[in-house]
Amino acid sequence: MGDRAASSSGPGRGICAGDTVLLADVGNSRIKLARLDDFAADAGLPTVARRQDLDSRGFHPDNLERWLLGVAPGPAVILVASVYEAAATRLEATVAEISATTHRPVRQRRIGHQDLPLAVALDEPHKVGIDRLAAAAAASLVKPAGRPAVIVDCGTAVTVDMVAADGRFLGGAILPGPALMARALADGTSKLPAVAALVGGELPAMPGRSTEAAIAAGIGHGIRGAVARLVAEARAASGGDAATILTGGWADAVRDVLPDAVVIPDLVLTGIALGAGRACGR
């Protein structure tokens, strides 16, 4: 998708020239927003700040407007990476409306796999979720030199992906996250209730002494076991010396089963920032 102008930033200017650079990670549950403060910080990764989360399935425009006007007092460009097209389209339309009504120039551009500093060793890279690729791009910069890496992203879905020692994205595994597992049990049976599993990273009791507690135990401990096994399989496939990088909203729930993992909370946004750097000619 090419550049989309919510408001023109003037003739002859590049997509980011002189503008505040904003980032949007549009996921299945949340839209994660941030401002890009530094294209290349000391650790080699961009610095993101002023984080704001919105509900992907419905957010109040006023919340987006307050954040947007607070982080970008002048012209801005927002780089959008999305795995949820309807939410991304609504975000872009709302940004365009805010730009028009407040007379603040805001340009918009989608980030695709071709914008990331990442070689994708798959036949159809355009079909891989941009969130997975963005996380891998960031991980390839922070992993130890000469070693492969396994990236675990704990979101609506869990992804366990592999980056080769030379930085190539090799693919990985995807499984439902705890909320999806709970919803599948509630929707696919006549009597099992919907439960909240792994809320706040708290581990459920085992044995569960009610139906709800038993579901929470099955999901909570089951997903921890699944993640640990997938990481072990990925490390074995890579020769056993892969670094493990952990991110996502409920990452704390699996941290103890991945004791050697390095936790990077905003790994996907950081990867999107790398794509922004390329899009902005940095």
Would you name each region that the model predicts?
Residues 40-90, 179, 184, 192-198, ...:
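N-terminal phosphate-binding loop and adjacent alpha-helix
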Residues 63-77, 98-99, 230-242:
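Phosphate/pyrophosphate-binding loops at sites that engage ATP/ADP/AMP, CoA/4′-phosphopantetheine
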Residues 74-84, 106-109, 238-249:
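Short glycine-rich phosphate-binding loop at a beta-alpha junction
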